[in-house]
Each structure stands twice: as C-alpha cells, then as structure tokens.
C-alpha cells in the first residue's frame, strides 16, 4: 500500500504456510524496483519481525517499519528504526492495509474465492485490487458538492 493516498501497489497470492510471506517480501521489493517504484520504507506486522528479513530489506536500502514482536524474544528492529517519527507514523498508517483487505473481502467478494490454483486466484486478486484502486482514485479526485 502506498501511504500518501492509500492505493494498492502490489498484490500477490502465495500458498498457505507459516513462512511464505517472509520469503516473498524481498522478491516483491525487487519487482517494484523493476517497475521504477523505489520505496524507502515498508510497513509490516509482527509476523515479519525476523532477523533474516530485516537484513535482506536493509541490504536493498529499504527501511523495515516492522511491528516489534517481543513475545519471549528480542525484536529484530532496533532503536535505529523505532526512534524516528516516521516509524510511529508508519505503524499508524499500517492499519489502512487491513481496511484494504476488508474491502477486498466484503465489497470485492474475495472472502471466499471461486477459483482454484495460484494463477487463477492471483489473476482474480489483481482484478479486485484494480477495482479497489479505481474506487479509491474516484474518491480522491471527486470534487465536494456545495451544501
């Protein structure tokens, strides 16, 4: 998600596993750079707080704004990141991603897909994501009507 306007930047469907998400993030960052989109930061939830992922993102000159997972261990995010005002802002804006998922599931009808296979589900996801962006763009450019 792009922070300024809340637009969906990329959408990827993977197999359901506990570690697939962390393995995919670096390749998504590489794909975004190939499309000339150079994010300086990426906001992620607690499930992405691993030393390996944080190191891979920093190697790509992307600052990981990962929610700290301190349940029984030390977080991979240190004070270099958390002391900046941008980190706090990113953590607040991160909740908008959940709003996108809510829209995709309710309005977009993507709660229970009727397709099978990663390719078909991924294509359907791109269509629903594009519809979300169109609705979002329409709201952004809409002129308010005088009362």
List where the protein language model places each region.
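Anion-binding and metal-coordination hotspots
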Residues: 1-147
């Amino acid at each position: 998600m792009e922070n300024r306007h809340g637009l969906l930047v990329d959408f990827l469907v993977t197999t359901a596993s506990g570690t697939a998400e962390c393995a995919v993030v670096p390749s998504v960052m590489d794909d975004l750079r190939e499309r000339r989109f150079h994010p300086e930061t990426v906001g992620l939830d607690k499930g992405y707080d691993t030393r390996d992922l944080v190191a891979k993102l920093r190697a790509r000159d992307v600052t990981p704004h990962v929610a700290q997972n301190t349940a029984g261990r030390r977080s991979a995010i240190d004070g270099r990141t958390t002391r900046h005002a941008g980190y706090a802002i990113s953590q607040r804006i991160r909740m908008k991603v959940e709003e996108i998922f809510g829209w995709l599931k309710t309005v977009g009808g993507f709660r229970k897909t009727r397709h099978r296979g990663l390719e078909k589900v991924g294509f359907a996801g791109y269509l629903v994501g594009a519809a979300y962006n169109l609705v979002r763009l329409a709201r952004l450019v809409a002129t308010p009507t005088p009362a």
